[in-house]
């Protein structure tokens, strides 16, 4: 009869090794479950404000900083994804441990102790002893159930904490992904702007080179025109000197012509006076010299000599003016 009592006293002390191992594996590192996210990922708390774009003339230093910022964000994103994966694994383990604990508790509840029926021939003391054994078994079962409930509640709390952290990490990952995409877009935009700026710079350099060539051609043309202008100035000075000479010669010719005209006009007057004298003499000596051929010849010879002497004088004056 003491044999079943001993078996009954050992019954509540048995525990599933799988449950104990799972509980130890999930609760062996409480600091790992309760420490904040920033301890495991110190870079997640950094300032994630996107840098302002620099415009069409972006400095290469700012582009380098933008590239380093993107690489830093990518490393943070990878770290956050790794922590998210670890938390998911922990959550799966905790839920599995919770499920195993619930199954064990359900199995304990459904499993009733096989109590032997008291025999009629037993003595009254043995019945009292069996009643004590059942009470002890009941108390131990209640304690075991309470322990299981406490463990389940603890697992529930741990699962809730893990879910909250999982949610925070998911939000952090989404934020980092969005910022990473934004920075990548900014980097692409900066690259495009730099390409456009480089193309414009090349175009301006080509225009400057073309303008330089045109300027050289213009300088050469200016030098040629300057030489032509100098030659024209020299020709002009030469022509002006010749014009002055011609003007002086013309003035001399005019004076000579005036002198010749004066001489000619003086000879005409003298010829007129002589003809008047001759006419008066003819009137005076009309009866005596009429029809005399000698007088007619003398008058003709005198006027011809005067004319030839006037022409000779004009020629001499003309030669003298020309020599001057």
From Swiss-Prot:
Which residue ranges traverse the bilayer? none
Region annotation Disordered: where it falls in the sequence: 1-74, 91-156, 175-201, 289-324
Q: Which segment of the chain is annotated as a signal peptide?
A: none
Reply yes or no: does the keyword Coiled coil apply: yes
Q: Which residues form a coiled coil?
A: 62-266
What keywords would UniProt list here?
Coiled coil
Question: What residue spans carry the Basic and acidic residues bias annotation?
Answer: 29-50, 95-106, 118-156, 313-324
User: What ranges does the record list as Low complexity composition bias?
Assistant: 13-28
KW Coiled coil (keyword) present: yes
- Share what the entry says about its subunit structure, partners included: Interacts with ARAC11 in vitro.
The family assignment reads:
Belongs to the ICR family.
Functional note: Acts as a scaffold, mediating interaction of ROPs with different proteins.
Descriptive protein name: Interactor of constitutive active ROPs 4
